[in-house]
Amino acid sequence: MSTNKLAVLNALDTARTQWYHVTAIVIAGMGFFTDAYDLFCISTVSKLLGRLYYYDPANPKHNPGKLPTPINNFVIGVALVGTLTGQLFFGWLGDKLGRKKVYGITLILMVICAICSGLSFGSSARSVIGTLCFFRFWLGFGIGGDYPLSATIMSEYANKKTRGAFIAAVFAMQGVGIIFAGLVSMILSKIFLQLFPAPAFEDDEIFSTQPEGDYLWRIVLMLGALPALTTYYWRMKMPETGPASDMGRVLDIEIDEEHDKLSQFKEVNKYPLLSREFFQRHGLHLIGTMSTWFLLDIAFYSQNLTQKDIFPAMGLVHKAPQVNALREVFETSRAMFVVALLGTFPGYWFTVFLIEKIGRFIIQLVGFFMMSLFMLIIGIKYDYLKNDNKWLFATLYGLTFFFANFGPNSTTFVLPAELFPTRVRSTCHALSAAAGKAGAMIGAFVVQSYTLDEDSKKIQHAVLVLAFTNMLGFCCTFLVTETKGRSLEEISGEDGGVGYYHDTEMSSRPTGARQSGRMEAI
């Protein structure tokens, strides 16, 4: 660290972990819990929607009702379109108006649209699905705002020794949300099964689809509003990271504003986002964060959104004609829950505990490589694994989830919150996250089209393409740099050699006064 660094820029860098750090992790993390639940719970009930609204008794193949491919892709993918637009809009707004002012808006949108998604009524299948897609777009819009705002707020609260772990801990709540998406659907479908038993489709095509299932999918979607609703009050109580008056109020300290030095600091660092100086300093990093997140989400969302179609090949669920509608929801949800609990969830927390020891760069590099390796094995040996070794298939498949989360799914969220200057940090994180959601849309609208009919050759080709995609992510990781153990200003070059830093002055200050510095600098 430069010895002439502004005293105010020590902000949170040398501070010990305090209670408000933990509070911020929980509050921001509950947003990601809600995000993950809302985005992934639809996969547990999408086949039920097909049985309820698209069963054709005149179908000569005598198959259960199934959402047509374009409609299935849109039902599952429309929230991702909303997420992409929400990331760009709220990321920009967070830099213009401040993080706190728009942080509550995203939560309100998520609550209202989660409830309205479950109230999607109509006189025809088309009107029900159309209304559902409308509200899920705006649900995704609110979810999108949470990505840049939560990451930016957490990075600006934390000290440099724990910053990566804190941001990763917020993001790790996504894993808990995915688990609960499977768990809630599993519990509710089991209750409905006990109350409304029915024969398998192959035994009775009509009565195998319980009409009460129409309540099940609505309840599953509406429950996504609860965690967001419970944290709204606390989110509004969080201090703004920008104005020092808020942080001073929280920490009960008086702030040394150092106005002259701050004026010099701001003069040096006021170049805009769309400028030659920005691209000279940060252009490669922005390309790196956008490309790696884009490539990662093609694979990650393809896995998560299409796993319901791969579960039969792994022997984790029965084929559709062998079960009734509610039983299919139960088996799909149970399989999602098991994969998330054993594969997805541990990966997030390995990252939290090791990110400050190993570093972001190595975790991301190894994660991409291992994902590519396991998918390559699955793709090459698909027929053998499907027919002769389903447990090995399930293990390899679970390991791809583990290394996605103990790997690029976590680090692509952390790095954009650290690499860029304060005044454009939220916008740059939003651009990176939006690139990721563009990749997720490829997973939802393109890859899912290959897996929907459960054709072995198509699934095999899709997995091999994803293996190649992960290897491209491995290569693009070299465009970013390690941020472990460095302050945000040092990483982004914001200190710029302006001002000076007195060890004795800082050591004589109360801890809270040192912590408040970055808030004033911002």
Which functions belong to the PLM regions below?
Residues M1-I522:
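Transmembrane-helix signature of 12-pass secondary carriers
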